[in-house]
């Protein structure tokens, strides 16, 4: 089967891009031919044999930037210009999607969050129109919904709110939904009467990941630290919902100069760098400048060089050097970094991010130290310290979690879910 994937950006480290890459791996292993249509191929070249670029589909295109600004951030009194803009550029994208479907002879479409979250209005409109026009079987991989983001996608214009309600999420009769947590499945059913398949984030538990080697043994030196330090790794982007301030406060509470916190992600998605500046101020206030490191310039998703000969480390390298991982998020659609830590056999300290963590992950029986509402208690810190300073206990916990992860969040699980979704989509069309 020729399967076409539509996505705003692919190749980076955000959850949508990472999970899409895994879907592609499994779908190819199932014998399907995969073609990708994207607005941006991030941190890697595009393969013209199977991949097609549509610049207007990028979240950072002038067209999308302008419409997001006028719809949600700096709306004008009269939305007519915005509506005309949306109609015009959605038609541009629609025509390119239709051409691509014909040229690649697409049998089934997968819309990667583009039909769920209105972060690119024109792309969502174009996909909606193409799916309805062609009647092609479609899977919408819904990572986030507008109502999960507070008032981020609430406009003062009724016309825009009505439009968002109509287009997102896509609800064509020839489409089926894949959601990433049980809360989303319940909400989709309650709001729209739409059933869905709950597909968790997964990892390939047969790959070598998070293993120490000659290259990543150099990592402490490249960060300016000693090899006998104890490293807590925060392997996420720097955005407010990641709760990184709790990890910084943990370092303060442990009160040990040998404990270092390494934050691997950048703050490119932090609007105005406001959250990043708050973290810097907190580090200064707690006098942790020698213990907390923003090391995003050292890391690339796959450890690729930046082109000038400097060493770049992969996320696997980061996990390999971690004593433990911090993951104090206040909200996640699922939790990619959690599964990565499990795969890397590293203990993890987590915030009970509601409404997802406990029902979809914690209830499986993983051994973690869990805090509530981002607040560290003396008991929490004591439990974390026991793991940090006891390598035997850390290994016991990590090995236990690895076996659970292999059972619930492996490529085998994803393959079963994709077989179900493809069957549902082809039956619905």
Where are these regions (language model features)?
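A short, active-site helix/loop in glycosyltransferases that binds the activated sugar's phosphate group
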Residues: 149, 155-214, 278
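Aromatic "clamp/platform" in nucleotide-sugar-dependent glycosyltransferases that forms part
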Residues: 330
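A charged, aromatic-enriched C-terminal amphipathic alpha-helix characteristic of glycosyltransferases
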Residues: 372, 379, 389-422
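Conserved donor-binding/catalytic core segment of Leloir-type glycosyltransferases
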Residues: 5, 226-242, 248-251, 261-264
């Amino acid at each position: 089967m020729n399967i076409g994937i539509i996505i705003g950006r692919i190749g980076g480290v955000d959850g949508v891009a990472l999970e899409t890459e895994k879907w592609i791996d499994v779908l190819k292993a199932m014998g399907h031919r995969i073609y990708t249509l994207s607005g941006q191929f991030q941190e890697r070249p595009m393969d013209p044999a199977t991949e097609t670029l549509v610049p207007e589909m990028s979240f950072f295109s002038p067209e999308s930037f302008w419409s997001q600004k006028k719809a949600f951030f700096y709306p004008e009194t009269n939305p007519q210009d915005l509506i005309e803009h949306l109609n015009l550029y959605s038609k541009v994208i629609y025509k390119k999607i239709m051409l691509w479907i014909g040229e690649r002879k697409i049998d089934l479409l997968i819309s990667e969050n583009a039909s769920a979250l209105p972060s690119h209005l024109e792309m969502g409109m174009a996909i909606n129109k193409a799916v309805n026009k062609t009647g092609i079987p479609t899977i919408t991989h819904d990572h986030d919904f507008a109502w999960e983001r507070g008032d981020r996608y609430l406009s003062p214009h009724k016309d825009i709110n009505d439009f968002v309600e109509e287009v997102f999420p896509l609800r064509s009769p020839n489409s089926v939904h894949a959601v990433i947590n049980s809360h989303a499945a319940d909400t989709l059913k309650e709001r729209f009467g739409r059933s869905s398949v709950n597909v968790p984030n997964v990892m390939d538990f047969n790959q070598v990941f998070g293993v120490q080697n000659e290259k990543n043994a150099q990592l402490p030196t490249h960060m300016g630290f000693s090899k006998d330090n104890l490293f807590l790794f925060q392997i996420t982007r720097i955005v407010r919902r990641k709760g990184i301030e709790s990890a910084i406060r943990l370092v303060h509470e442990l009160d040990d100069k040998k404990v270092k916190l390494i934050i691997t992600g950048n703050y490119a998605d932090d609007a105005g760098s406001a959250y990043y500046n708050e973290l810097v101020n907190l580090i200064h206030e707690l006098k942790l400048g020698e213990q907390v490191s923003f090391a995003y310039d050292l890391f690339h998703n796959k450890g690729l060089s930046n082109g000038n000969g400097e060493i770049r480390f992969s996320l696997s390298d980061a996990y390999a050097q971690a004593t433990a991982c911090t993951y104090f998020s206040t909200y996640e659609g699922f939790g990619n970094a959690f599964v990565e830590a499990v795969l890397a056999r590293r203990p993890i300290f987590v915030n009970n991010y509601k409404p997802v963590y406990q029902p979809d992950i914690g209830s499986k029986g993983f051994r973690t130290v869990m805090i509530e509402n981002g607040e560290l208690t003396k008991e929490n810190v004591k439990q974390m310290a026991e793991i940090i300073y006891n390598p035997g206990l850390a290994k016991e916990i990590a090995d236990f979690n690895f076996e659970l992860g292999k059972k619930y969040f492996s490529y085998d699980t994803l393959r079963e879910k994709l077989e179900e979704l493809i069957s549902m989509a082809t039956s619905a069309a």
